[in-house]
Amino acid sequence: MMSTPSIIKSVANPYYVTNSKYFVNSEGSEILQNFTDVIIEMIATAHESGLTQSVNITEGGRGGLELIQNKSQESAKEIANKASELINAKPVKEEKTTLVMNPDFVSLLTHEILGHPSEADRVLGKEMAWAGGAWWKGKIGEKIGSENLNVFDDPTIKESLGWYYFDDEGVETKKTNLIENGILKNHMQNRETSEIFNSVPTGNMRATNYRYMPLIRMACTCIANGNQNVDEIIKDVKNGYYISNMKVPSIDMKRYNWSISCQYAQKIENGELTDLQRDVIVMGNAPEFFNSIDACGNDFTVRPITYCGKGDPMQSMIMGNGGPTIRGTATVKSVN
């Protein structure tokens, strides 16, 4: 990374986490699960003419070193090049417009605005710490997004950071469809909440370790794959922006209004990617944005989320989130 023009600092931090859980209950269950997570966090910082720009990325999954060895060099080159290019980029002009969002950005959007509100304890108001409300409380069976929006949680996706076989209530994991064609169908449930919602436990009850009570937690919540080529999604945009890679979220207590900054963006003009944009924030409200989605790509990707806090006292958890490239309408503005 340091050989790239204008790069003044680069960091690569590889690490692994081992996790062993032994579960026994009065129903006769005896379950031992062992997992190893391998992760590498990288950041490249460029500085020139009084302007500093940084781009970071995290790669990893549940498995062996091959999960990061195959991606780390390519990702390191990409973030170094982007940080260098951002030195000459301009801040974005504030406007409400068409946005094409790449899978990395979509993964954080999914995590914050679709995943957490799908945890049934938050829907019921039983876990309100850390923006613990749910913007779709009481709306099961109602339309909350466009027919292009399909969302699921799936702890069985192998090699994702949300992959496991049984939760901390001894419930076997499975894929749970949360939203189908824009209709809210279900929440992530534990044994208690499933009775309230006339549902079944979904295998999402997890604790950070033995010292904490389990909470309903995302495993691998994603927007489902679409059938459109990404180039075609961009080509259909007359005026808009291509939003790349997650940065920092800000949400209200019900996760209704949200803003998420991205690492960088590109202007779309008459179906072509043009000028690089820096310091970009994307803002919207949940129902308006999700109803505006008119395209989902065929490039489904699961990204690593290495830190998620929930509860009081707060518990941290790692998980996967993802989706394909999506297109919708929201507001962009510059940080500065």
Regions found by a protein language model. Name each.
Residues M1-N336:
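N-terminal small-residue-enriched
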